[in-house]
Amino acid sequence: MATCSSDRTIKVFDTGTTTTTTSGDGGGGGENVANPPPPQEAIVERANATTLTGHEGPVWQVSWAHPKFGALLASCSFDHTVMIWKETSSNVFSRVYVTPKGFFDGSVNAISWAPHEFGCAVAACSSDGSVAVISSNSNVAGGGWRSEKISNEAHAVGCTGVSWGQNDEIASCGCDNLCKIWTRGGAQEGGGGGESSNHNQHHHHNQQQQQQQWRLKKELRGHSDWVRDVQWAPNNGGSNVQQIASCSQDGKVFIWTESNNNSSTTTANKDYHSVLLNDFKTAVWRLSWSVVGSVLAVSDANNQVSVWKESVDGAWTQIQSK
């Protein structure tokens, strides 16, 4: 488990669970069947494994890559950088990449890894208004890394949140009261002719580079103040219908659902309609979907976390508050 702090550090905790069981007292009289001893509870041991230093400002977020790529951790900071960390041996992490100086011209506020099937890549957004993708040049984690901007002017005044969806599209939000959806432009097909063995090794990577041409697909308008977070729901039961949750300084949480008003298999011309989950009457900071995308957790400025679930009629109801 990784945590980050305004003290500029990242802490990685190695968690483990051990369970011990009780046995008879060995006194020769047999167990008291009527009043057996209570079972001993599981003991959870948590030890501070390591502290990662290197950021020169508060660290806002950390996020683990898919295990397919090994123990890779991304971090973003007020110091204008994204860093990639790799576990090189047990509880030992090395920094394998940092975005170049000047690549971001403001605090990097949020990061989101791509679903593993789209490669080893993480999206990041900054107070300078830009959205970027940092990706490994191969499917082998720890290989060469590169950074590229999706847009230098994604959100006026600044970008506050980013989420990489399972449809290989990126959602971002910002201080312009908007959520935006970014999709890859069409890549050209590879040329003909004979291919050497070396060409075969790099052909897939070259195709990936061609596909890294992102374009704005949709603007989602509904909030009246800064949008603080946006989160793409995991595909619910394998459904092709896309859902995005957004929350704002205006106190509202919206659920945006891709319209399904035509039979086209492409999403290029589809729109999104919104449903107001709730007006919390205070700023809403963060959102988090359950693994299957059917439950949404919401945290607000009243120090409350509430959990919401969609009913069969499309309305959202609160199921837990803590």
Where are these regions (language model features)?
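WD40/WD-repeat beta-propeller blade-loop signature
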Residues: N48, P58, F69, S107, ...
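Loop/turn segments within WD40 beta-propeller blades
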Residues: S63-G70, S112-G119, G161-D168, Q231-V241, ...
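Conserved strand-to-loop turn within each blade of WD40 beta-propeller repeats
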Residues: C4-D7, S75-D79, A124-D128, S136, ...
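C-terminal interaction modules of eukaryotic adaptor/scaffold proteins
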Residues: K270-K322
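WD40-repeat beta-propellers
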Residues: I10-D14, V62, V82-E87, I111, ...
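Short loop/turn segments immediately following beta-strands, especially the blade-tip
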Residues: D14-Q40, K86-V92, S135-G143, T183-Q201, ...
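WD40/WD-repeat beta-propeller blade N-cap
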Residues: E45, L52-V59, T99-V108, S151-C159, ...
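Acidic/hydrophobic-patterned starts of short beta strands in beta-sheet-rich repeat architectures
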Residues: M1, A71-L73, C120-A123, I170-A171, ...
